């Protein structure tokens, strides 16, 4: 089983997909039926759809196979030769069946091979089966040696918490041998932790006819388990094993013994669980029908009117019936599964699918035993047949789960035993699936929300299988989907007093008796009913998020569980953020209006609407509220309901929603009141809320450009390619751009691409064409000034236009410029057109990016959480010191778009925070080398094109960058356009994966803890200071702070921010870092936060780079002379070069350890607490004097004789 964990994490290795031509040319070769192929090895089952035909002996006559195309040509030449045709053997019946099954059942041979390999990895190793068999023999002998007698006090604690304990229990040794149950019996054990369930039946002599009442049976079962455990511990065969008690399925009435063997060969992955059961004939079956009561009110000292009927205890009755009917149900499963490898493998596929989604956990879990019973049910109904393959078993179960309704009840009982009681029994449960006895509901504890979620996941699996353009295997089986990543909001209540308050004041006596005073299901029912009534269409599902109970030592007292609850809310994006809840009309339905007013309390008010109706209504906000505020409406409703109906204080509740939206809010240090604009700006605004202002301004500018008179050429199209146009700019864009001294100053520029009409008068020389473009831009600027009164400025990149406080950079796009960039003349004078980095960059910016930008804008319109998810993701990457030169911003946008496009969840993401968590999962668990991220916008890619691209990617992986992204607009550059080999590099991808895994661990830890506080943004959005060799601190007054919320630095503390407006389009620090990387990337890696970061972290390359080497003229870059005529790259020399390049920005250099020590020792730490007085002169002095003085103070020391580095010389 050592490989099980590996296969669940990584999945099977990538298999090359043959081109379509090859698939149609020869079906046998496409399906891998070559006689020498490894696929010819017999599979483990003859009925699972995966066994290859047994190879037949070859004829004695030798034949020669020609390679590749030569073989095809030879076949065509010999098309009509009868002698060669005689050598072609017709396919056998087995081969025909194999071809038909592969064509009908699977997408491709790749999907079939992946499923087959996974099933082979999941098979139990022989050492485990042998150990289990030997253990069962030993345990059987042990039970026969047990002696009858009175159970006295022992060192062990009885693993059951009850109010009234019994005494005088007499132990009787088992009369029936222990038996394997569950997966161990059906042959479907699943790792990596193999749990073997063993049932030991308690004889009837231990029980009396009235023990079904008031938890007496449960106490005797726990005492029986305690006695057996005590005897096992004293037996030499088990004395070295580890013993612990636990609750089965988080049910405090179901204690089991967990035994971990001491044998080294199995102790790491094997665990045995001992269940105590009772004979089915112990009690009358009629005692446990759902409408009977088996826990009297007097047991809890409650008073009950004798004239009233006792409340039903259907859930407790089902708990006892589970033990009584276990043997009968297990016999049915054994009959269906033993010897049928296809059913066993099908159930294994379903168990992997269910476990990856965490829907089988806890008290309310949809266990795998339900799936096993459902397979038997489908076989009884003749929907599944004995010859169905394992794939058909899994697919049929998913299809039937998605299209059948269990709320009305289904049953395994024989037809003769089915009565009209099925519908009656279904009325006592949310979901009803009766067992073979017709008495036990296998889904007694499954709430309706969990069942509907299972159905939705099953429907998604079928849809993925039906999508012929997609390899659905990783989405169904490989991707781990924790439940907290599937929900949009989480409600968490862990305060003990609040839990007890809800149980005492709001739990009905019937619920207490029904669940034997177990608090968790009572809380779940109270909260679910209340929230469903209040939220209505705003939520699609309310799901319990359970943590599996932990085992405890057998000497310790049984813990009390169920004292906390977590609920996950899956929101409906169409209705979740509506600001109004409208009640019934007070005139037409006064009773309904009064009930509405009572339910909502003081929040409800009588209102008159535009249609003249007068109704009660609750208003949660205004239509003008920012999207981030609207996303908190559900939180506002839930908190009000809990306070109004359950009297809970807000301090005792944690509602997890939009905590991470803080990272793209406007910094409180920046005051919007100082911005001169006609726009209404709020101090608590954010980047998402400000984006529409920029988009509206751009639309107005586009109209003005189209309306310009007397232009030499007509403007055909205008496209914005800035991130803000697709709601992907994480920095708040404020209307603060200004014209100062004939220059435009702005913190952001919005890039606009203008396409002109066709003309044959453009010059054929590149520099002349660009000069003409500049002249055209100048004319546009002059006309904008004359006709629209807009200020403008020309730069080497394009035309800067100032409008309403926003700065736009206009660029002209013309096909001829792209052709001239590609043009090359060979030595023979032949002109050809070849792609090069410059031409690709121009084609991307002018022609592809406008289309992709429009597609991403449309994606945000259909999924409003897409934009804010990108904002959070970009901020997280930036705070990990990953700037645009290391990780392209478009890579983040496309990866998040891939999340929103792929159908790996039944519901769309409604909350940006959930989208970000899924983005972290994508970074943490992606196979960068084997995965090509395809974005098929508007489904414009055909299946053939997708197949060809995937084949090219797998067959020529080295020609693609480490992170391969492809959109349907990339044309021939698909997979190579948005990233490069160094941006991001494979090392950076590995680094980001580690960071993402660490962030997910922090999130999971905070969710699983009893602490009400969710992980703080400052914990997630602050990079680590570990691993860096040097930190260069920059002058804080020369590096403007970002307008977004400052989450701090991993190196130093906060200081007074500055918000200087730089020249439009200028980023001096980014330019310097680019120079450093161009010149010194072979010796050091450079990291900084592009969102206002004021430190430059340096990581040296491995020591081998700095070792002395022989003197060579061609290898003197950054070298210094050393002994014996050798040269060496000296780190100190490089540091001096860094200082020279940084010039005025450089403040000081130190190691991270020194900074930590200074922070600990400094009493009043600031962001730059060691700056010299000369560097902090009064702001009244001119900037030139200030920079000159700082440069003089920080002038580099004189160096010894060395060879000046060539990169530095060239840069100067």
Swiss-Prot record:
Q: Region (Disordered) spans which residues?
A: 1-72, 1156-1212
Q: Which GO terms describe its biological process?
A: ribosomal small subunit biogenesis; rRNA processing; tRNA export from nucleus
Q: Name one GO molecular function term.
A: RNA binding
Q: Which UniProt keywords apply?
A: Chromosome, Nucleus, RNA-binding
> Spans of biased composition, class Basic residues?
1197-1212
Which Gene3D superfamilies would you find in this protein's record? 1.10.1410.10, 3.30.70.3030
Q: What is this protein called?
A: Nucleolar protein 6
Per the UniProt record, the source organism is Drosophila pseudoobscura pseudoobscura
């Amino acid at each position: 089983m050592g490989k099980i964990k590996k296969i669940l994490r990584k999945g099977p290795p990538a298999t090359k997909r043959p081109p379509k031509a090859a698939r149609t040319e020869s079906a046998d070769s496409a399906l891998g039926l070559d006689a020498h192929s490894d696929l010819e090895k017999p599979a483990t089952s003859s009925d699972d759809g995966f066994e290859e035909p047994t190879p037949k002996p070859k004829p004695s006559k030798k034949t020669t196979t020609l390679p590749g195309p030569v073989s095809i040509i030879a076949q065509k030449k010999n098309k009509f030769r009868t002698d060669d045709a005689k050598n072609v053997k017709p396919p056998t019946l087995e081969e025909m069946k194999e071809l038909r099954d592969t064509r009908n059942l699977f997408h491709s041979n790749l999907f079939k091979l992946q499923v087959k390999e996974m099933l082979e990895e999941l098979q139990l190793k022989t050492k485990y089966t042998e150990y289990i068999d030997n253990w069962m023999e030993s345990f059987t002998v042990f039970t026969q040696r047990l002696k009858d007698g009175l159970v006295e006090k022992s060192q062990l604690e009885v693993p059951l918490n009850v109010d009234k304990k019994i005494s005088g229990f007499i132990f009787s040794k088992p009369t029936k041998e222990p038996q394997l149950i569950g997966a161990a019996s059906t042959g479907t054990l699943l790792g990596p932790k193999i749990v073997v369930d063993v049932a030991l039946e308690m004889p009837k002599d231990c029980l009396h006819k009235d023990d079904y009442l008031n938890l007496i049976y449960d106490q005797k079962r726990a005492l029986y388990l305690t006695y057996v455990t005590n005897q096992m511990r004293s037996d030499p065969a088990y004395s070295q094993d580890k013993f612990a008690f636990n609750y089965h399925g988080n049910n405090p009435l179901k204690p089991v013994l967990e035994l971990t063997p001491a044998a080294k060969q199995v102790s790491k992955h094997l665990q045995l669980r001992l269940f105590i059961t009772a004979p089915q004939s112990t009690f009358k079956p009629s005692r446990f029908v759902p409408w009977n009561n088996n826990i009297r009110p007097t047991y809890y000292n409650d008073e009950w009117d004798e004239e009233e009927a006792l409340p039903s205890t259907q859930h407790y009755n089902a708990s006892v019936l589970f033990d009584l009917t276990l043997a009968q149900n297990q016999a049915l499963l054994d009959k269906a599964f033993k010897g049928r490898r296809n059913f066993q493998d099908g159930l294994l596929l379903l168990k992997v699918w269910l476990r990856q989604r965490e829907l089988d956990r806890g008290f309310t879990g949809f266990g795998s035993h339900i799936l096993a019973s459902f397979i038997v049910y489908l076989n009884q109904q003749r929907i599944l047949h004995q010859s169905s393959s394992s794939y058909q078993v899994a697919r049929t179960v998913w299809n039937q789960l998605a299209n059948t309704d269990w709320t009305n009840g289904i049953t395994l009982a024989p037809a003769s035993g089915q009565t009209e009681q099925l519908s009656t029994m279904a009325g006592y449960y949310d979901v009803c699936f009766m067992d073979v006895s017709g008495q036990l509901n296998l889904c007694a504890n499954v709430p309706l929300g969990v069942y509907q979620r299972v159905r939705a996941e099953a429907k998604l699996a079928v849809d993925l299988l039906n999508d012929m353009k997609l390899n659905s295997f990783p989405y169904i089986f490989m991707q781990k989907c924790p439940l907290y990543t599937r929900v949009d909001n989480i409600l968490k209540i862990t305060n003990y007093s609040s839990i007890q308050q809800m149980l005492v004041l709001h739990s009905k006596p019937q619920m207490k008796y029904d669940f034997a005073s177990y608090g968790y299901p009572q809380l779940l029912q109270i909260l679910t009913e209340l929230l469903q009534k209040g939220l209505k269409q705003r939520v699609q599902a309310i799901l319990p998020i359970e943590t599996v109970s932990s085992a405890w030592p057998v000497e310790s007292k049984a813990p009390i569980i169920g004292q906390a609850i977590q609920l996950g809310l899956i929101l409906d994006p169409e209705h979740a953020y509506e600001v109004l809840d409208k009640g019934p009309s007070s005139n037409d339905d006064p009773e309904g209006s009064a009930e509405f007013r009572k339910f909502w309390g003081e929040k409800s008010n009588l209102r008159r609407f535009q249609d003249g109706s007068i109704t009660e209504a609750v208003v949660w906000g205004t239509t003008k509220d920012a999207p981030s505020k609207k996303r908190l409406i559900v939180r506002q409703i839930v908190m009000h309901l809990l306070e109004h109906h359950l009297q809970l204080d807000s301090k005792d509740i944690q509602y997890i929603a939009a905590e991470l939206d803080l990272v793209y809010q406007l910094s409180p240090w920046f005051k919007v009141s100082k911005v001169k604009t006609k726009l209404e700006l709020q101090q608590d605004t954010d980047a998402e809320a400000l984006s529409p202002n920029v988009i509206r301004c751009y639309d107005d500018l586009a109209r003005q450009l189209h309306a310009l008179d007397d232009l030499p050429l007509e403007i055909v199209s205008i496209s914005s390619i800035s991130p803000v146009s697709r709601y992907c700019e994480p920095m708040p864009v404020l209307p603060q751009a200004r014209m100062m001294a004939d220059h435009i100053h702005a913190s952001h520029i919005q890039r606009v691409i203008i396409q002109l009409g066709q003309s044959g008068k453009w010059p054929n020389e590149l520099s002349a064409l660009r000069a003409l473009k500049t002249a055209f831009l100048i004319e546009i600027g002059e006309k904008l000034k004359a006709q629209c009164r807009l200020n403008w400025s020309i730069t080497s990149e394009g035309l800067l236009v100032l409008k309403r406080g926003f700065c736009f950079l206009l660029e002209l796009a013309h096909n001829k410029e792209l052709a001239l960039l590609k043009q090359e003349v060979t030595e023979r004078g032949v002109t050809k057109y070849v792609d090069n980095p410059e031409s690709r960059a121009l084609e991307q910016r002018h022609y592809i990016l406008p289309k992709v930008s429009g597609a991403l804008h449309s994606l945000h319109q259909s999924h409003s959480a897409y934009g804010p998810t990108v904002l959070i993701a970009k901020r997280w990457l930036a705070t990990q010191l990953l700037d645009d030169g290391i990780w392209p911003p478009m890579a983040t946008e496309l990866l998040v778009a891939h999340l929103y496009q792929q159908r790996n969840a039944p519901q769309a993401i409604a909350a940006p925070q959930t989208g970000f968590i899924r983005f972290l999962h994508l970074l943490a668990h992606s196979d960068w080398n084997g995965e090509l991220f395809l974005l098929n916008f508007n489904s414009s890619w055909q299946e053939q094109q997708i197949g060809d691209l995937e084949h090219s990617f797998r067959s020529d992986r080295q020609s693609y960058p480490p992170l391969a992204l492809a959109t349907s607009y990339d044309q021939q550059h698909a997979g190579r356009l948005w990233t490069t080999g160094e941006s991001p590099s494979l090392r950076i991808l590995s680094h980001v994966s580690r960071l993402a895994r660490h962030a997910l661990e922090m999130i999971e830890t905070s969710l699983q803890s009893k602490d009400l506080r969710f992980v703080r943004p400052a914990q997630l959005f602050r990079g680590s200071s570990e691993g860096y060799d040097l930190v260069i601190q920059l002058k804080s007054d020369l590096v403007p702070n970002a307008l977004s919320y400052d989450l701090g630095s991993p190196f130093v503390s906060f200081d007074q921010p500055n918000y200087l407006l730089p020249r439009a389009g200028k980023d001096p620090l980014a330019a310097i870092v680019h120079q450093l990387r161009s010149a010194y990337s072979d010796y050091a890696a450079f990291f900084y936060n592009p969102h206002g970061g004021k430190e430059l972290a340096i990581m040296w390359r491995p020591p081998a780079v700095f070792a002395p080497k022989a003197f060579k003229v061609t290898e003197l870059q950054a070298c210094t002379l050393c002994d014996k005529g050798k040269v060496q790259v000296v780190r100190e020399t490089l540091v001096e070069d860094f200082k020279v390049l940084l010039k005025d920005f450089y403040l000081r250099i130190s190691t991270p350890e020194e900074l930590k020590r200074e922070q600990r020792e400094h009493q009043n730490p600031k962001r730059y607490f060691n700056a010299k007085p000369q560097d902090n002169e009064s702001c009244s002095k001119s900037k030139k004097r200030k920079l000159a003085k700082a440069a003089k103070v920080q002038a580099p020391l004189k160096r010894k004789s060395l060879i000046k580095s060539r990169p530095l010389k060239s840069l100067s």
